[in-house]
């Protein structure tokens, strides 16, 4: 069921994107995910994340995994035809300014989003990366239709903060969205012949600190939570892949579209 909008949100120019259908996870894929377990296969040690820069694919591109260093991981791979690194950076700089932007990403599960760094996000003297690096988003989302939405705070940092090699980043043609924890995650977008592909990783039991990546106490690998997270990630990023090229072309130079001066965000 779609998130209910306020009257002001219904008047938002982005409403046409809200009206677009959001596809469920394909039946065969959903059935495959529901059979997955963290015990099925070994993932990657966090220290090996710079292998993401290598050509080709790793054995752990999609599914639930136990890692050799003791943690666990959820991984997803999303084809994004027509999407570029510039679009993806723009999206993470732009969408945190207004809840309606977050809702159209996944209108069934996304309820609220507000960057805590509005001036930084609106600062046109900064690059798109600089407009979301070292910022915090307050969000409210559900991971499935039968779950209640819960609040969370997401911090976005430069990828080297979570262990990516600064030298490799200099020549990388894609982009990496990095969140240091308490659930350490990153979205590694790299170019393809028809656009980009997104390699998402969620590491349970890890956190980025001033002293580097540390292992932290974590609940035992929960297969049900892992499957729910993967299903949600498949749905939301598949939909973003569909709408992002048009959104970017229409609003890439408009960071204030639909912003309500009365604060109905």
Regions found by a protein language model. Give the residues of each.
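Short, glycine/acidic-rich hinge or "gate" loops at secondary-structure transitions
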Residues: 101-112, 254-259
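Terminal, regulation- and interaction-focused segments at domain boundaries
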Residues: 66-87
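Terminal "cap-and-tail" regions of soluble proteins that handle hydrophobic small molecules
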Residues: 2-68, 192-265
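Amphipathic alpha-helical segments
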Residues: 81-102
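A general secondary-structure signal for short beta-strands and their flanking turns/coil
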Residues: 71-73, 182, 195
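A short, structured loop/turn motif at beta-sheet edges
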Residues: 82, 164-167, 188-197
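Glycine-rich portal/gate segments that line the openings of hydrophobic small-molecule binding cavities
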Residues: 107-180
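Hydrophobic/aromatic beta-strand elements that line small-molecule binding cavities or substrate pockets
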Residues: 77-78, 183-191, 201-204
């Amino acid at each position: 069921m779609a998130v209910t909008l306020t009257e002001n949100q219904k008047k938002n120019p982005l409403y046409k994107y809200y009206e677009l259908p959001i596809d469920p996870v394909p039946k065969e894929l959903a059935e495959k995910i529901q059979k997955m377990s963290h015990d099925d296969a070994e993932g990657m040690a966090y220290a090996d994340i710079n292998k993401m820069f290598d050509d080709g694919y790793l054995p752990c591109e999609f599914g639930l995994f136990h890692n050799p260093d003791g943690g666990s991981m959820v991984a997803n791979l999303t084809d994004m035809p027509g999407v570029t690194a510039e679009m993806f950076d723009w999206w993470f700089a732009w969408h945190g300014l207004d809840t309606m932007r977050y809702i159209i990403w996944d209108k069934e599960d996304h309820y609220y989003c507000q960057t805590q760094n509005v001036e930084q996000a609106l600062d046109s003297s900064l690059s798109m990366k600089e407009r979301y690096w070292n910022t915090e988003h307050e969000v409210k989302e559900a991971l499935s239709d039968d779950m209640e939405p819960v609040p969370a705070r997401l911090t976005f940092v430069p990828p080297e903060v979570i262990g990516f090699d600064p030298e490799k980043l200099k020549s990388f043609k894609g982009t990496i969205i990095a969140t240091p924890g308490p659930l350490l995650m990153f979205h590694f977008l790299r170019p393809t012949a028809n656009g980009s592909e997104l390699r998402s990783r969620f590491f349970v039991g890890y956190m980025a600190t001033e002293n580097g990546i540390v292992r932290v106490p974590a609940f035992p690998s929960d297969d049900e939570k892992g499957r729910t997270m993967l299903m949600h990630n498949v749905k939301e990023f598949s939909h973003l892949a569909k709408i992002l090229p048009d959104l970017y072309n229409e609003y890439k130079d408009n960071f204030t579209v639909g912003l309500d001066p009365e604060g109905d965000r």
